Amino acid sequence: MLRQVLALRGALTPATRAQYAAVVGGNILSREDAWQRSVEFLFERLAVRWEIAGTEPITRQKELLARFRFASVEERRWIRETLRAHLAEHFPDMEAP
């Protein structure tokens, strides 16, 4: 896999945490959908910079989200692992996707 660096925020507002809890709870008929939405929600709220293989870092929110949606299966797995580790360190009270 290419060398990647994802910079994430270290704070979430109480309102954002409440929104995330609602997303994680999601549609009880589709746990997979709720899981996918929770990963995208966290990425959208936490990602501030993404450097891929030494290229110019992506820092604009719209571009970050567009690149996330275009990510390969391997990149999405790496993003999930990165988000889980970040939640464990900075937000241990939040449920990881």
Question: What do the PLM-derived regions correspond to, one by one?
Answer:
Residues L2-P97:
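Short, surface-exposed, charged amphipathic helix/loop patches that serve as local interaction elements
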